[in-house]
Amino acid sequence: MPVTIVLGGQWGDEGKGKITDALAATADIVVRPNGSTNAGHTVVTDEGVFKLHVIPSGILYPHCTCIIGAGVAVSPPDFLREIESLRERHPRLGQLYVSDRAHVIMPYHPLLDLYEERRRGAAGIGTTLRGNGPAFTDKIARRGIRIADLLPGSERSLRHKLETLLPEKNTLFIHLYGESPLDLDQLFEQARTWGEALAPYVIAAEVFVQDALDAGKSVIIEAAQGTMLDPDYGTYPYVTSSSPTAAGACQGAGVAPTQVDRIVGVFKAYTTRVGAGPFPTELTDETGQLIRERGREYGTTTGRPRRVGWFDAVAARYSARLNGMTEAALTKLDMLDPLPEVRICVGYRIDNQEVSAPPAQVERYAAVEPVYEVLPGWQCDTSQVTSFDDLPPEAQRYVARIEELIGVPITMIGVGPARRQILWRPAGALT
Protein backbone atom coordinates (compact mmCIF):
# COMPACT_ATOMS: atom_id res chain seq x y z
CA MET A 1 0.00 0.00 0.00
CA PRO A 2 2.36 2.74 -1.19
CA VAL A 3 1.31 6.09 0.32
CA THR A 4 3.63 9.09 0.11
CA ILE A 5 3.00 12.27 2.10
CA VAL A 6 4.44 15.54 0.80
CA LEU A 7 4.36 18.28 3.42
CA GLY A 8 5.91 21.63 4.28
CA GLY A 9 8.67 21.76 6.86
CA GLN A 10 8.63 25.52 7.44
CA TRP A 11 5.90 28.20 7.40
CA GLY A 12 4.43 27.20 4.04
CA ASP A 13 5.35 28.25 0.48
CA GLU A 14 8.23 25.74 0.42
CA GLY A 15 7.60 24.48 -3.11
CA LYS A 16 5.38 21.50 -2.34
CA GLY A 17 3.52 21.90 -5.64
CA LYS A 18 6.72 21.44 -7.64
CA ILE A 19 7.71 18.33 -5.67
CA THR A 20 4.21 16.83 -5.80
CA ASP A 21 4.04 17.47 -9.54
CA ALA A 22 7.34 15.64 -10.01
CA LEU A 23 6.27 12.64 -7.92
CA ALA A 24 2.76 12.55 -9.45
CA ALA A 25 4.25 11.57 -12.82
CA THR A 26 4.20 7.97 -11.56
CA ALA A 27 1.30 8.17 -9.07
CA ASP A 28 -2.29 7.03 -9.50
CA ILE A 29 -3.97 9.36 -7.00
CA VAL A 30 -3.13 12.70 -5.37
CA VAL A 31 -5.16 13.79 -2.34
CA ARG A 32 -5.31 17.25 -0.81
CA PRO A 33 -6.01 16.63 2.90
CA ASN A 34 -6.18 20.06 4.55
CA GLY A 35 -6.36 23.80 4.14
CA SER A 36 -8.49 25.72 1.69
CA THR A 37 -8.15 28.29 -1.07
CA ASN A 38 -5.89 30.21 1.32
CA ALA A 39 -3.05 27.94 0.14
CA GLY A 40 -1.28 28.27 -3.18
CA HIS A 41 0.84 25.69 -4.98
CA THR A 42 2.72 26.62 -8.16
CA VAL A 43 3.58 24.16 -10.94
CA VAL A 44 5.67 25.10 -13.98
CA THR A 45 5.38 22.99 -17.14
CA ASP A 46 6.21 23.50 -20.81
CA GLU A 47 2.69 24.97 -21.12
CA GLY A 48 3.34 27.71 -18.59
CA VAL A 49 2.87 28.53 -14.92
CA PHE A 50 -0.14 27.02 -13.11
CA LYS A 51 -1.11 28.48 -9.73
CA LEU A 52 -3.27 25.98 -7.88
CA HIS A 53 -5.18 26.76 -4.71
CA VAL A 54 -7.48 23.95 -3.63
CA ILE A 55 -6.99 21.47 -6.50
CA PRO A 56 -4.12 18.97 -6.03
CA SER A 57 -0.96 19.43 -8.09
CA GLY A 58 -1.36 16.08 -9.86
CA ILE A 59 -4.28 17.47 -11.89
CA LEU A 60 -2.00 18.30 -14.84
CA TYR A 61 -1.41 14.58 -15.51
CA PRO A 62 -4.31 12.95 -17.42
CA HIS A 63 -3.62 9.58 -15.77
CA CYS A 64 -3.83 11.00 -12.25
CA THR A 65 -7.00 11.06 -10.15
CA CYS A 66 -7.11 14.05 -7.80
CA ILE A 67 -9.20 14.23 -4.66
CA ILE A 68 -10.06 17.09 -2.31
CA GLY A 69 -10.28 15.33 1.04
CA ALA A 70 -12.55 15.62 4.05
CA GLY A 71 -10.07 17.85 5.88
CA VAL A 72 -10.35 20.67 3.34
CA ALA A 73 -12.68 23.65 3.64
CA VAL A 74 -14.07 24.14 0.13
CA SER A 75 -15.21 27.46 -1.32
CA PRO A 76 -17.55 26.28 -4.11
CA PRO A 77 -17.23 29.39 -6.32
CA ASP A 78 -13.44 29.38 -5.99
CA PHE A 79 -13.28 25.66 -6.75
CA LEU A 80 -15.52 25.96 -9.81
CA ARG A 81 -13.56 28.95 -11.14
CA GLU A 82 -10.27 27.15 -10.62
CA ILE A 83 -11.30 24.01 -12.49
CA GLU A 84 -12.79 26.06 -15.34
CA SER A 85 -9.60 28.10 -15.65
CA LEU A 86 -7.50 24.93 -15.73
CA ARG A 87 -9.68 23.38 -18.43
CA GLU A 88 -9.28 26.44 -20.63
CA ARG A 89 -5.49 26.19 -20.48
CA HIS A 90 -4.97 22.44 -20.12
CA PRO A 91 -7.80 20.41 -21.71
CA ARG A 92 -6.34 17.00 -20.76
CA LEU A 93 -6.71 17.12 -16.99
CA GLY A 94 -6.84 14.23 -14.58
CA GLN A 95 -10.10 13.12 -12.96
CA LEU A 96 -11.19 15.31 -10.03
CA TYR A 97 -13.36 14.48 -7.02
CA VAL A 98 -14.41 16.19 -3.78
CA SER A 99 -15.16 14.46 -0.48
CA ASP A 100 -18.79 14.63 0.59
CA ARG A 101 -17.48 15.15 4.14
CA ALA A 102 -15.46 18.30 3.34
CA HIS A 103 -16.76 21.46 4.98
CA VAL A 104 -18.02 24.40 2.95
CA ILE A 105 -16.84 27.99 3.18
CA MET A 106 -20.20 29.72 3.26
CA PRO A 107 -20.76 33.37 2.20
CA TYR A 108 -20.67 34.54 5.82
CA HIS A 109 -17.23 33.04 6.51
CA PRO A 110 -15.09 35.51 4.45
CA LEU A 111 -17.14 38.36 5.95
CA LEU A 112 -16.42 37.14 9.47
CA ASP A 113 -12.74 36.86 8.55
CA LEU A 114 -12.62 40.41 7.20
CA TYR A 115 -14.63 42.04 9.97
CA GLU A 116 -12.66 40.31 12.75
CA GLU A 117 -9.30 41.31 11.26
CA ARG A 118 -10.54 44.89 11.05
CA ARG A 119 -11.71 44.78 14.65
CA ARG A 120 -8.34 43.48 15.86
CA GLY A 121 -6.43 46.17 13.99
CA ALA A 122 -2.69 45.95 14.61
CA ALA A 123 -3.24 42.77 16.65
CA GLY A 124 -4.66 40.92 13.64
CA ILE A 125 -3.39 37.47 12.68
CA GLY A 126 -2.75 38.40 9.05
CA THR A 127 -5.16 35.90 7.50
CA THR A 128 -5.79 35.61 3.76
CA LEU A 129 -9.41 36.76 4.39
CA ARG A 130 -10.78 33.74 2.48
CA GLY A 131 -12.97 32.53 5.34
CA ASN A 132 -10.76 29.58 6.17
CA GLY A 133 -10.56 30.20 9.93
CA PRO A 134 -14.28 30.87 10.48
CA ALA A 135 -15.19 27.78 8.43
CA PHE A 136 -12.96 25.56 10.57
CA THR A 137 -14.30 27.27 13.70
CA ASP A 138 -17.80 26.18 12.70
CA LYS A 139 -16.51 22.68 11.94
CA ILE A 140 -15.02 22.24 15.41
CA ALA A 141 -18.10 23.84 17.02
CA ARG A 142 -20.23 21.22 15.18
CA ARG A 143 -22.28 23.78 13.32
CA GLY A 144 -20.62 23.62 9.89
CA ILE A 145 -22.18 22.93 6.51
CA ARG A 146 -20.61 20.03 4.59
CA ILE A 147 -20.56 19.26 0.88
CA ALA A 148 -23.11 16.49 1.44
CA ASP A 149 -25.54 19.07 2.86
CA LEU A 150 -25.58 20.99 -0.44
CA LEU A 151 -26.42 18.11 -2.75
CA PRO A 152 -29.77 17.81 -4.55
CA GLY A 153 -32.26 16.01 -2.31
CA SER A 154 -30.92 17.65 0.86
CA GLU A 155 -32.79 20.95 0.49
CA ARG A 156 -35.04 20.55 3.52
CA SER A 157 -32.23 19.71 5.94
CA LEU A 158 -30.02 22.41 4.42
CA ARG A 159 -32.61 25.11 4.96
CA HIS A 160 -33.20 23.94 8.53
CA LYS A 161 -29.48 24.16 9.27
CA LEU A 162 -29.24 27.64 7.79
CA GLU A 163 -32.29 28.77 9.78
CA THR A 164 -30.43 27.66 12.91
CA LEU A 165 -27.05 29.11 11.94
CA LEU A 166 -27.83 32.45 10.37
CA PRO A 167 -29.33 34.29 13.37
CA GLU A 168 -26.05 33.83 15.25
CA LYS A 169 -24.01 35.14 12.32
CA ASN A 170 -26.32 38.10 11.82
CA THR A 171 -26.12 38.95 15.51
CA LEU A 172 -22.35 39.21 15.16
CA PHE A 173 -22.62 41.24 11.97
CA ILE A 174 -25.04 43.76 13.49
CA HIS A 175 -23.99 44.07 17.13
CA LEU A 176 -20.25 43.29 17.14
CA TYR A 177 -19.14 44.53 13.74
CA GLY A 178 -21.82 47.11 12.90
CA GLU A 179 -22.46 45.55 9.48
CA SER A 180 -25.55 44.48 7.52
CA PRO A 181 -27.17 41.06 8.07
CA LEU A 182 -27.46 38.35 5.41
CA ASP A 183 -30.78 37.23 3.93
CA LEU A 184 -31.81 33.61 4.57
CA ASP A 185 -33.57 33.08 1.24
CA GLN A 186 -30.64 34.40 -0.76
CA LEU A 187 -28.19 32.31 1.26
CA PHE A 188 -30.25 29.14 0.79
CA GLU A 189 -30.61 29.68 -2.95
CA GLN A 190 -26.88 30.29 -3.32
CA ALA A 191 -26.03 27.12 -1.41
CA ARG A 192 -28.55 25.07 -3.40
CA THR A 193 -27.07 26.32 -6.68
CA TRP A 194 -23.59 25.39 -5.50
CA GLY A 195 -24.79 21.89 -4.69
CA GLU A 196 -26.11 21.37 -8.21
CA ALA A 197 -22.80 22.50 -9.73
CA LEU A 198 -20.69 20.38 -7.36
CA ALA A 199 -22.74 17.18 -7.57
CA PRO A 200 -20.78 15.55 -10.46
CA TYR A 201 -17.55 15.78 -8.45
CA VAL A 202 -18.76 14.48 -5.09
CA ILE A 203 -17.80 11.04 -3.77
CA ALA A 204 -17.13 9.22 -0.50
CA ALA A 205 -13.45 10.04 -0.86
CA GLU A 206 -12.11 7.96 2.02
CA VAL A 207 -13.80 4.84 0.60
CA PHE A 208 -12.43 5.61 -2.88
CA VAL A 209 -8.88 5.97 -1.52
CA GLN A 210 -9.05 2.81 0.57
CA ASP A 211 -10.43 0.81 -2.36
CA ALA A 212 -7.59 2.14 -4.51
CA LEU A 213 -5.01 1.09 -1.94
CA ASP A 214 -6.57 -2.37 -1.73
CA ALA A 215 -6.16 -2.57 -5.51
CA GLY A 216 -2.45 -1.72 -5.25
CA LYS A 217 -2.69 1.88 -6.49
CA SER A 218 -0.10 4.47 -5.45
CA VAL A 219 -1.31 7.52 -3.52
CA ILE A 220 0.32 10.88 -2.80
CA ILE A 221 -1.09 13.07 -0.04
CA GLU A 222 -0.20 16.69 -0.78
CA ALA A 223 -0.49 18.70 2.43
CA ALA A 224 -1.01 22.46 2.32
CA GLN A 225 0.79 25.14 4.36
CA GLY A 226 3.69 24.10 6.64
CA THR A 227 4.37 22.43 9.96
CA MET A 228 5.26 25.68 11.74
CA LEU A 229 1.71 26.86 11.02
CA ASP A 230 0.14 23.87 12.78
CA PRO A 231 -2.41 24.95 15.42
CA ASP A 232 -0.84 22.63 18.02
CA TYR A 233 2.87 22.74 17.20
CA GLY A 234 3.31 25.99 15.28
CA THR A 235 3.64 29.62 16.35
CA TYR A 236 0.16 29.77 17.91
CA PRO A 237 -1.93 31.92 17.53
CA TYR A 238 -0.17 32.91 14.30
CA VAL A 239 -1.09 29.63 12.65
CA THR A 240 -3.52 28.11 10.18
CA SER A 241 -6.76 26.35 11.12
CA SER A 242 -6.11 22.77 10.01
CA SER A 243 -3.15 20.50 10.65
CA PRO A 244 -0.42 20.55 7.96
CA THR A 245 1.52 17.71 9.64
CA ALA A 246 1.82 14.06 8.61
CA ALA A 247 -0.80 13.18 11.23
CA GLY A 248 -3.16 15.82 9.85
CA ALA A 249 -2.54 14.60 6.31
CA CYS A 250 -3.61 11.08 7.24
CA GLN A 251 -6.72 12.37 8.98
CA GLY A 252 -7.77 14.65 6.14
CA ALA A 253 -7.14 12.08 3.42
CA GLY A 254 -8.79 9.14 5.16
CA VAL A 255 -5.57 7.12 5.31
CA ALA A 256 -4.20 5.22 8.30
CA PRO A 257 -0.65 6.02 9.52
CA THR A 258 0.32 2.37 8.99
CA GLN A 259 -0.45 2.75 5.28
CA VAL A 260 2.22 5.45 4.84
CA ASP A 261 5.71 4.36 3.82
CA ARG A 262 7.26 7.66 2.68
CA ILE A 263 7.11 11.15 4.18
CA VAL A 264 8.81 13.85 2.11
CA GLY A 265 9.42 17.14 3.91
CA VAL A 266 9.86 20.15 1.64
CA PHE A 267 12.11 23.03 2.70
CA LYS A 268 13.28 26.16 0.95
CA ALA A 269 17.04 26.73 0.96
CA TYR A 270 16.14 29.81 3.01
CA THR A 271 13.03 30.59 5.07
CA THR A 272 9.88 32.62 4.41
CA ARG A 273 6.60 33.26 6.12
CA VAL A 274 3.49 35.32 5.39
CA GLY A 275 1.68 37.44 7.95
CA ALA A 276 2.44 38.13 11.59
CA GLY A 277 4.23 35.90 14.07
CA PRO A 278 7.73 35.06 15.33
CA PHE A 279 10.43 34.65 12.67
CA PRO A 280 13.89 34.41 14.31
CA THR A 281 16.01 34.51 11.13
CA GLU A 282 14.12 37.31 9.36
CA LEU A 283 16.17 39.57 7.11
CA THR A 284 14.98 43.15 6.80
CA ASP A 285 18.07 44.41 4.97
CA GLU A 286 19.24 44.45 1.35
CA THR A 287 20.06 40.74 1.45
CA GLY A 288 16.48 39.92 2.38
CA GLN A 289 15.15 42.16 -0.36
CA LEU A 290 17.50 40.55 -2.91
CA ILE A 291 16.30 37.06 -2.00
CA ARG A 292 12.66 38.21 -2.07
CA GLU A 293 12.98 39.65 -5.56
CA ARG A 294 15.03 36.77 -6.96
CA GLY A 295 12.65 34.22 -5.46
CA ARG A 296 9.52 36.20 -6.39
CA GLU A 297 8.44 35.82 -2.80
CA TYR A 298 4.90 37.09 -3.10
CA GLY A 299 1.89 35.04 -2.06
CA THR A 300 0.31 32.81 -4.73
CA THR A 301 -3.14 33.50 -3.30
CA THR A 302 -2.83 37.02 -1.87
CA GLY A 303 0.12 38.58 -3.70
CA ARG A 304 1.44 39.80 -0.34
CA PRO A 305 5.24 40.07 0.00
CA ARG A 306 6.61 37.23 2.07
CA ARG A 307 8.98 37.81 4.94
CA VAL A 308 12.40 36.36 4.14
CA GLY A 309 15.17 34.96 6.36
CA TRP A 310 18.08 32.57 6.58
CA PHE A 311 17.52 28.81 6.82
CA ASP A 312 16.31 27.95 10.32
CA ALA A 313 17.69 24.50 11.10
CA VAL A 314 16.22 24.50 14.62
CA ALA A 315 12.66 24.82 13.33
CA ALA A 316 13.45 22.48 10.42
CA ARG A 317 14.79 19.72 12.67
CA TYR A 318 11.78 20.12 14.97
CA SER A 319 9.52 19.72 11.95
CA ALA A 320 11.44 16.72 10.62
CA ARG A 321 11.18 14.87 13.94
CA LEU A 322 7.54 15.80 14.52
CA ASN A 323 6.52 14.42 11.12
CA GLY A 324 8.81 11.41 11.02
CA MET A 325 10.22 12.55 7.68
CA THR A 326 11.92 9.80 5.71
CA GLU A 327 13.51 12.24 3.26
CA ALA A 328 13.60 15.91 2.36
CA ALA A 329 13.47 18.12 -0.71
CA LEU A 330 15.39 21.41 -0.70
CA THR A 331 14.00 23.97 -3.14
CA LYS A 332 15.18 27.29 -4.56
CA LEU A 333 18.86 26.70 -3.94
CA ASP A 334 19.58 28.86 -6.99
CA MET A 335 18.06 31.91 -5.31
CA LEU A 336 21.16 32.10 -3.11
CA ASP A 337 23.57 32.08 -6.08
CA PRO A 338 24.77 35.74 -5.86
CA LEU A 339 25.49 35.80 -2.13
CA PRO A 340 29.13 35.96 -0.95
CA GLU A 341 28.17 34.08 2.21
CA VAL A 342 25.17 32.13 3.47
CA ARG A 343 24.02 31.61 7.03
CA ILE A 344 22.24 28.77 8.78
CA CYS A 345 20.56 29.19 12.15
CA VAL A 346 21.96 26.28 14.19
CA GLY A 347 20.64 27.28 17.61
CA TYR A 348 18.32 29.53 19.63
CA ARG A 349 19.14 31.61 22.69
CA ILE A 350 16.76 33.35 25.08
CA ASP A 351 18.29 35.44 27.89
CA ASN A 352 21.69 33.88 27.11
CA GLN A 353 20.31 30.38 27.60
CA GLU A 354 20.30 27.81 24.82
CA VAL A 355 16.89 26.64 23.60
CA SER A 356 16.81 23.36 21.68
CA ALA A 357 13.37 23.67 20.07
CA PRO A 358 10.75 26.31 19.25
CA PRO A 359 9.17 27.57 22.51
CA ALA A 360 5.45 27.02 22.99
CA GLN A 361 4.79 30.56 24.23
CA VAL A 362 4.72 32.97 21.32
CA GLU A 363 6.23 35.79 23.39
CA ARG A 364 9.27 33.63 24.18
CA TYR A 365 9.59 32.61 20.55
CA ALA A 366 9.57 36.28 19.54
CA ALA A 367 12.46 36.86 21.98
CA VAL A 368 14.68 34.18 20.40
CA GLU A 369 18.17 35.22 19.30
CA PRO A 370 19.38 33.03 16.43
CA VAL A 371 22.83 31.44 16.58
CA TYR A 372 24.34 31.41 13.10
CA GLU A 373 26.88 29.30 11.30
CA VAL A 374 28.41 31.17 8.37
CA LEU A 375 29.36 29.32 5.19
CA PRO A 376 30.97 30.66 2.01
CA GLY A 377 28.65 31.35 -0.91
CA TRP A 378 29.23 30.00 -4.41
CA GLN A 379 28.45 33.11 -6.48
CA CYS A 380 27.74 31.33 -9.74
CA ASP A 381 24.66 30.19 -11.66
CA THR A 382 23.31 26.82 -10.50
CA SER A 383 20.05 26.91 -12.48
CA GLN A 384 21.53 24.97 -15.42
CA VAL A 385 23.18 22.27 -13.31
CA THR A 386 21.79 18.79 -14.00
CA SER A 387 23.39 16.70 -11.23
CA PHE A 388 24.37 17.25 -7.63
CA ASP A 389 28.01 16.47 -8.37
CA ASP A 390 28.09 19.39 -10.80
CA LEU A 391 27.08 21.92 -8.15
CA PRO A 392 29.86 24.19 -6.87
CA PRO A 393 31.62 22.65 -3.84
CA GLU A 394 30.30 25.45 -1.62
CA ALA A 395 26.70 24.69 -2.64
CA GLN A 396 27.26 20.98 -2.01
CA ARG A 397 28.63 21.81 1.42
CA TYR A 398 25.60 24.00 2.19
CA VAL A 399 23.16 21.22 1.27
CA ALA A 400 25.15 18.60 3.19
CA ARG A 401 25.26 20.80 6.30
CA ILE A 402 21.49 21.32 6.24
CA GLU A 403 21.01 17.58 5.87
CA GLU A 404 23.26 16.97 8.86
CA LEU A 405 21.42 19.52 10.99
CA ILE A 406 17.87 18.34 10.24
CA GLY A 407 18.77 14.64 10.43
CA VAL A 408 16.96 13.67 7.22
CA PRO A 409 18.49 12.69 3.85
CA ILE A 410 17.98 15.30 1.14
CA THR A 411 16.96 13.40 -2.00
CA MET A 412 15.73 16.27 -4.20
CA ILE A 413 17.26 19.69 -4.78
CA GLY A 414 15.42 22.39 -6.72
CA VAL A 415 17.51 24.77 -8.83
CA GLY A 416 14.69 26.43 -10.76
CA PRO A 417 10.92 26.38 -11.31
CA ALA A 418 10.76 23.94 -14.26
CA ARG A 419 10.11 20.22 -13.95
CA ARG A 420 13.59 19.42 -15.25
CA GLN A 421 15.26 21.62 -12.63
CA ILE A 422 15.34 19.02 -9.87
CA LEU A 423 18.56 17.26 -8.90
CA TRP A 424 17.71 13.74 -7.76
CA ARG A 425 19.87 11.99 -5.17
CA PRO A 426 19.51 8.56 -3.54
CA ALA A 427 18.78 8.61 0.19
CA GLY A 428 21.93 9.02 2.22
CA ALA A 429 24.07 10.02 -0.75
CA LEU A 430 25.04 13.35 0.77
CA THR A 431 26.42 11.99 4.03
Curated annotation (Swiss-Prot):
Main EC class the enzyme belongs to: ligase
Positions with a binding annotation for substrate: 300-306
Swiss-Prot/TrEMBL catalytic activity: IMP + L-aspartate + GTP = N(6)-(1,2-dicarboxyethyl)-AMP + GDP + phosphate + 2 H(+)
Catalytic residues (UniProt): 13 (proton acceptor), 41 (proton donor)
Listed EC numbers: 6.3.4.4
Binding positions for GTP per the UniProt entry: 12-18, 40-42, 306, 332-334, 414-416
Requisite cofactors: Mg(2+)
CDD domains in the cross-refs: AdSS
The UniProt record lists the keyword Chaperone: no
Keyword Acetylation found: no
Textual note on the cofactor: Binds 1 Mg(2+) ion per subunit.
InterPro entries with a match to the protein in the record: Adenylosuccin_syn_GTP-bd, Adenylosuccinate_synth_dom1, Adenylosuccinate_synth_dom2, Adenylosuccinate_synth_dom3, Adenylosuccinate_synthetase, P-loop_NTPase
PROSITE patterns found in the cross-reference section: ADENYLOSUCCIN_SYN_1 (PS01266)
A GO biological-process term: 'de novo' AMP biosynthetic process
Coiled-coil ranges (or none): none
Residues binding Mg(2+), per UniProt: 13, 40
Keywords from the named record: Cytoplasm, GTP-binding, Ligase, Magnesium, Metal-binding, Nucleotide-binding, Purine biosynthesis
Family matches, as Gene3D superfamilies: Adenylosuccinate Synthetase, subunit A, domain 1, Adenylosuccinate Synthetase, subunit A, domain 2, Adenylosuccinate Synthetase, subunit A, domain 3
A GO term for molecular function: magnesium ion binding
Gene Ontology annotations for the cellular component aspect, listed alphabetically: cytoplasm
Residues binding IMP, per UniProt: 13-16, 38-41, 128, 142, 225, 240, 304
Protein function: Plays an important role in the de novo pathway of purine nucleotide biosynthesis. Catalyzes the first committed step in the biosynthesis of AMP from IMP.
Family: Belongs to the adenylosuccinate synthetase family.
NCBIfam families tied to this protein: PRK01117.1, purA
Protein name: Adenylosuccinate synthetase
Organism: Thermomicrobium roseum (strain ATCC 27502 / DSM 5159 / P-2)
